[in-house]
C-alpha cells in the first residue's frame, strides 16, 4: 500500500530406507523434500475498479475475531488492527487507550504506552491511524486453514481518519496485514507478521504469493485456496524460475521493497524504482520527472512495459476498467517510486525472502 512515512506443522525431512538382504537388490533411499511451513488461502473482492485481496485473522491474543479480513499488503510492513471488539470498550477513548504505567495486559495482549501514527495512501488521498505498539499471538487464516504466530509486535489503533477530509472512519475499515521487508518507518519495532515464525533449518523465512485468480474477484469476498506459501524451500529459491532482486537498506525502515527498473510508454523510457503493491487497489502510478502535468491518466490501449536491472520484464495494455495507469510528476506526488497496483499480481508471481533480503518476480 502506498505509504508516506507506515498448521501446518513443518514437514520433516525423511529418509526412507528399503530393507535388504543378500538376495535382494539394493534400493536407493527415497528422499522427501521439505515443504513450505504453511499454505493458506486468501479472499479476493472487487468494488467497481478496486480490487482487494484480504487475509483472515481469526484470533488476536485470546480473542476470537469475526470477519476481520485485513488487506494483504506487499507495500507496507506490519499488522495494524482496530482495537474495537478486541479489548474492552471502556479502555478506548477518542484520544487514546486508558493505560496506567508502561503497559497493560488484557485478553492476552500487551498494550504499551508507546504511541505512533501510521499513514497509508498517496497524494490523492490518504488515511492516518492513531494507536500504540502492542504484543500478541496472532492466528492467521480461518477454518479453511490457519497458523498461529509466536508473540509478535503489532499496531493497535483506536482511531483512523481520512487525512484530506478529517472524517473519522468506521472501526476495522483500515486494518492492514503488511508483509513488506524491513520495519514500519513510524513504528520501527514492527515488522511483517510472516517474518517471526521459527522455521526448520532447511526452510528460509519469507513467503511466495501465487498468481491471483482474476475470476474470483467478485462483490462478495471469495476464498481462493493455495495463494500464500509461508516459508521458502530450496526449490522456491533455486528451481522455480523466479528472477531475484537484491534489496537496498535504509537506516530508517530497513530493507526497502523498491526495485530498480526502466518503465516504457508512448516512446518514453523512464528510469526509476518500482514498488509492486497488492495494497494499491486500482491505479498504477508512474513517476516521471519529465511529465508536463502534475497528474494525467494514460488513455486506454496504451502499452506499458518494464524491465528490471536483474532482467525481469513485463508488459500490459491499459484498459478502461483495469490496468488503469496514471503518470505523475514527483514534484507533485513527493514520491519518486513508481507504484504497480494489484493488477500486476493477476499475471505474475511474487516472492519475498526475508532472510537474504531479496524479492523474486516471475511471469505466468
Residue ranges and their predicted role:
Residues 21-364:
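Pepsin/retropepsin-fold aspartyl endopeptidases
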